UniProtKB/Swiss-Prot annotation:
It comes from Burkholderia mallei (strain ATCC 23344). This is Protein-glutamate methylesterase/protein-glutamine glutaminase 2. PROSITE patterns: CHEB, RESPONSE_REGULATORY. It holds the Pfam family Response_reg. The gene is cheB2. It is found in: Cytoplasm. GO terms for biological process: chemotaxis.
Length: 342
């Protein structure tokens, strides 16, 4: 991949160069020392991937990410000195379209752990995502389960741009919303707890991480919280699984949506928000085929129009809506939750 580096610290740039040099398939295309220069470089020489710092002069990493995604979209990985200490900025950057975040590697060679490996793992993961052209294979469909006395389930998938889209959606829901919500957002497990707390600050409904054995409850939002795939079991409870192993992103939206089709015995609504790639498109299609109402975010309001675009292209969405209309549509649908939504 051709990689752009955005960082104003010479030692950090050198550490990034050395890490990239470990893989012959990658090369440094350019180095920018602030967000304004990065935007100019992205327009003039579009990279496959940008390694974006957060704290820089003139234009910071969050603003630069937003500007790049508006004018010259590409994959962006936040690489900063201390991700944990900058968690709120990380979520803002991911809301603007960044795919993930990782600490800047150091030049120190002491110790048993290789400081370059976390960054290389993230680059490899994004490389697989960019290389994916075919949709993921769908799990075999189970026979439709009889409907039971369960709350409606709103299954939501999101990736790049998701944090901002999720806050905009959740804050529009009433605090007595009578459905259960489960979110699969492409985010590393290191950030999941912090993201749940961050979303909780915007949402009238409580937002918690989904744990092994959690049961979706009306009026509660559960967020996938590990690098394994969140799914519903045959008992209708949430669990995590490593399979399928080869997926561009973990957790997978497709895996969760297919498990809703197979194992949720009540009504369900599928929502696919902004994101890069195709994850969730096949699962949303399966939900619609099962008779559930499905929504894809429109292009105009998506930070990255990849996942919802793929869903719309295969007829997976009952409706393609701007972000600001999705909450109202959910409220309306849940009020009529015993009707057939097709």
């Amino acid at each position: 991949m051709n990689i752009g580096i955005v960082n104003d610290l010479p030692l950090a740039v050198e550490a990034l160069r050395r890490t990239i040099a470990l893989r012959p398939e990658h090369r440094v295309l350019w180095v920018a020392t602030d967000g304004a220069q990065a935007l100019d470089f992205c327009v003039a020489q579009p990279p496959d991937l940008v390694l974006m710092d957060l704290v820089m002069p003139r234009i910071d990493g969050v603003s630069a990410t937003r500007s790049i995604m508006e004018r010259s979209p590409c994959a962006i990985l936040i690489v900063t000195a201390n991700v944990g200490a900058n968690a709120s900025y990380v979520y803002e950057a991911m809301g603007a379209g960044a795919l993930d975040a990782v600490d800047t590697p150091t030049l120190e060679q002491g110790g048993s752990a290789d400081p370059s490996q976390p960054l290389l793992a993230k680059i490899d993961q994004i490389g697989r995502l960019l290389a994916t052209r075919m949709p993921l294979a769908a799990p075999a469909a189970a026979a439709p389960a009889p409907q039971g006395a369960l709350p409606p389930l709103v299954a939501i998938g999101a990736s790049a741009g998701g944090p901002t889209a999720l806050t905009a959606l959740l804050r529009r829901l009433p605090d007595d919303f009578p459905a259960a919500l489960v979110i699969v957002q492409h985010v590393d497990q290191a950030f999941a707890i912090g993201m749940a707390q961050w979303l909780d600050g915007y949402s009238p409904l409580p937002v918690r991480i989904a744990r092994q054995g959690s049961v979706p409850q009306a009026g509660e939002v559960l967020l996938a919280a590990t690098n394994d795939h969140l799914h519903l079991t045959s008992r209708g409870v949430l669990a995590y699984t490593r399979r399928p192993e080869e997926t561009p992103y973990r957790p997978s939206v497709d895996v969760f949506f297919h498990s809703v089709v197979d194992h949720w015995k009540g009504e369900a609504i599928g929502v696919l928000l902004t994101g890069m790639g195709r994850d969730g498109a096949l699962g949303l299609k399966a939900m619609r085929t099962k008779g559930h109402y499905t929504i894809a975010q429109d292009e105009a309001t998506s930070a990255v129009y990849g996942m919802p675009k793929a869903a719309a292209a295969i007829g997976a969405a009952s409706a393609v809506l701007p972000l600001e209309r999705i909450a109202d549509q959910l409220i309306s649908l849940v009020q009529r939750n015993r009707q057939r939504w097709r």
